[in-house]
């Protein structure tokens, strides 16, 4: 990298301000910095990462200011304002495309037996490939085991698996050797599999941003696809517990942490409104963003 043989370097923001990486920037002319998942810079974003706040500091260490681009698939107006301000973008051109994807069908079910509902759906769509998102690793393990026992071609993915199994299972799904991926939200970043024709949420996510981002992995080939949430009141309790038990961020003050926790609870409330809505779900999502 220091010798300039790479045209593109992918790097986690956590590494930007390390001495090793700073020397790379000092040795080369950087023509452009692209920030993916830019919503992570905002405390109001669904995946706030303090390391994103250091990106402007890194840019200032370069010999000249490069073109800076920031991209995200899910950002409310409030988060978009934060992206402009916190990344210190200069005279930016802001492009916001429509959030509506007409080929996606959105539905919510409240079955007494979630696995039975999933099994019935898969039997009714025998040739379709898709993702089943679960809230916890334990649920991923349970659902994958049941699917395999019932003869479905399913693999699992969560942060508790060793990297080699995660890579193997991801490849099996992406290259159509496995029909179904059962995963936590650890799966999906950077995955662009065009023929995902359904995304089932076995549990309700903690916010609408995460739900829409995960559901949006369906139908990227433009063909009709299903995005179905299996909702139960227990999902709300589990999410509330996860919010309350989330590890404190040492980079934030106690006041900031309390504010973020309160924000997360409000987002969970909005997600619950979606899951229990009696109106058009597509309209609900478009209104939210």
Placement of each model-derived feature along the sequence:
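Helicase motor core with emphasis on the C-terminal RecA-like subdomain
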Residues: 1-256, 266
